Every structure is written in structure tokens, then in C-alpha cells.
Regions:
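A short, structured surface patch at a secondary-structure boundary
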Residues: 60-109
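Alpha-helical, coiled-coil/dimerization segments enriched in small aliphatic residues
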Residues: 83-86, 198-231
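Bacterial Sec-exported substrate-binding components of ABC uptake systems
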Residues: 4-8, 18-61, 159-190, 252-256, ...
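Charged, glycine-enriched surface loops/patches
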Residues: 124-161, 182, 260-279
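Short helix-initiation/N-cap motifs at beta->coil->alpha
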Residues: 43-46, 94-105, 227-237
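Proline-aspartate-enriched helix->loop->beta-strand connector
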Residues: 104, 111-116, 132, 240, ...
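Structured C-terminal subdomain patch of bacterial secreted/periplasmic proteins
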Residues: 243-307
Length: 307
């Protein structure tokens, strides 16, 4: 009888230990997500992180990474409120919650299962406590690579490849139709900011991806050197002739920049030849699929009308 009692007691301790172990494992799975519900994603910086296999509530904290998700049928539940200043993306994200960059509490209230932001985001540690957070790096990942990555995140790799293929075919067709207007020609993308003039590199929206990567136009030599490892250069008004060539894209918020009234501007070859393409930043600032399609439409039309 005594032996039976001891056996039963040991059995109870064993079962209790097993139950405790199972509870801990389930608790751990609930907190971090079951391994069957997650996948490993490699970020631009090389770090591998776990993200949901099928994210349903995505928050995007930089406008550049919104358009591809919308294009693939995965409209974010929350987006950075900068999109209010951009008609193209604002129209595409109607119904999404507008979020301030530093308003972490509001971001948490959207109950995201995935957050997409940039490597520069200062709130990254706080965001990671809310949901798995992907950091994108525009210096390491151009718009095509970013489109592929976003397709991978939402399991739409085929849609990403198809968009890129169709996009490249459109640009090649444009290039042939434009002929001598773009062959061997130089072009500069300019914007006036409160800090002065900005001339952009080859991967910064505002038509750069189209005229450089798509149409094969070139940067003036000085601009090319200065933007080889940077997003932009900042020439003075007096230096404009060194940074501009056959064509100029002038990106504005609808205003007439003061520098366009100066002699320095009026004496530029592109200006004298009426080779200035005007872009409204409220439609054309970013380099996502939706914004790029809009930019192409505007740039192609203006180039065709030029002599």
C-alpha cells in the first residue's frame, strides 16, 4: 500500500511538471507568435527578423513604401500623415488611419501585426514592442528592389515581378518613341527648398528613376560625381550652369520659385530652349509603383510636346 502511495505521488509530480512546461511553451508561443505563423525576412541591412507569414494589419511610416502594398491589394491600416500632402498617395489610402511619425501611442492603437519604417526611425525600439518592424534603407535598395521586398512581405512576389516587367516594357517603349529627345541627353532634377536649391541623384522620386534608369538620360558630370554616394547636391544659384544640361525637371509645390526670376536661371541652355519639365510634388514626390506611373504620364506628355 505504501509503495502504491509513493508511486501515485511521483506520478502526480511528473504530470504537474509536464503541464507546467507545456504552459510555458504555449505562453512563449503566444507572446512571440507561433513559428508556423511567422517567416524569416532579411532586411536591407542584412539582419534577419521574424514577421507574420500573412500580415493583415500593416502600418507604414514612410510614404515611399505605401504604393507597392496598395498596388498588390494590401492597403495599410495606418500610414504616415505626410501622405496628406500628396494627392496620389492620399487618394490611394482613403480610409487608412493617418499617423504622426513620433506618435507611438496612436500607432499602437491601430493594433498592427507588422510595421514598415526606415533605418533612420528614432522610435525603432518602441515600435518593435508594438509589432515586428521592418526597416527599409533607400541607399541600399532602389525602387525595384524595394518593390520586390514589399511583395515578399505580403506574399505577392509574382505581382511584384509582373509590375516590374510591365514597367520596364513601358519605359523601353517610351524611350524608342522619344528617340533623339533623350538619346545622349543630360537632365537635372531640381527643387527649391527653404534651405536652398537641391539637385537630386538617380533614385529619389520626382522622375529621377524614369529619366535616368528608364530613358537612359544622363546627369551632368558635376552632379553625377556629387550624388554618387548621396541622395542630392546643393548648388547655389550661381553654380546652376555647372549642374544643369539639356533638360531640367523642376519640382515644386505649385509655387513659382524665386530663383526662376533670376538671370542665372534664364541664361541656362535648358531654359532658353524651353526644355523645362514641371512636376507638382503633390503628385510626384515618391518612387513607389503608383507615384511612378503618375510621373511617367506627366513627363512623357511634356517631353513629346517639346521641340
Amino acid at each position: 500500500m505504501k509503495k502504491l502511495f509513493i508511486f501515485c505521488l511521483c506520478l502526480l509530480f511528473f504530470l504537474a511538471a509536464c503541464n507546467s512546461s507545456e504552459t510555458k511553451e504555449k505562453s512563449s508561443e503566444t507572446k512571440s507568435g507561433s513559428s508556423s505563423d511567422t517567416k524569416v525576412f532579411k532586411q536591407d541591412d542584412g539582419e534577419k527578423i521574424k514577421i507574420p507569414k500573412d500580415p493583415k494589419r500593416i502600418v507604414v511610416l514612410h510614404p515611399t513604401y505605401i504604393g507597392a502594398l496598395v498596388e498588390f491589394g494590401h492597403k495599410p491600416v495606418g500610414v504616415i500623415d505626410f501622405v496628406k500632402q500628396n494627392k496620389t498617395l492620399s487618394d490611394a489610402t482613403k480610409g487608412a488611419k493617418m499617423l504622426g511619425q513620433n506618435n507611438v501611442e496612436d500607432i499602437a492603437k491601430t493594433k498592427p501585426d507588422l510595421i514598415i519604417t526606415t533605418k533612420e526611425d528614432k522610435n525603432i525600439n518602441k515600435l518593435k514592442k508594438i509589432a515586428p518592424t521592418v526597416q527599409m534603407d533607400a541607399m541600399k535598395s532602389d525602387y525595384k528592389a524595394a518593390t520586390k521586398e514589399l511583395g515578399e512581405i505580403v506574399n505577392e512576389q509574382d505581382k511584384a515581378k509582373k509590375w516590374i516587367k510591365n514597367w520596364e516594357e513601358k519605359l523601353e517603349k517610351d524611350k524608342k518613341s522619344l528617340g533623339n529627345k533623350v538619346d545622349g541627353k543630360t537632365i537635372t532634377v531640381l527643387q527649391s527648398t527653404p534651405k536652398g536649391l537641391t539637385a537630386f541623384g538617380k533614385n529619389y522620386g520626382r522622375g529621377t528613376e524614369i529619366v535616368y534608369g528608364g530613358y537612359g538620360m544622363m546627369q551632368p558630370e558635376k552632379l553625377e560625381k556629387e550624388t554618387k554616394n548621396a541622395y542630392m547636391a546643393t548648388p547655389s544659384e550661381e553654380e546652376l550652369s555647372d549642374y544643369t544640361g539639356d533638360y531640367i525637371i523642376l519640382a515644386t509645390m505649385g509655387e513659382t520659385p524665386q530663383f526662376t526670376q533670376t538671370t542665372n536661371w534664364k541664361n541656362l541652355d535648358a531654359v532658353k530652349n524651353n526644355h523645362v519639365i514641371e512636376l507638382d510634388l503633390q503628385q510626384t514626390q515618391y518612387n513607389d509603383p503608383i507615384s511612378l506611373e503618375k510621373q511617367r504620364e506627366i513627363i512623357l506628355k511634356q517631353l513629346k510636346e517639346m521641340k
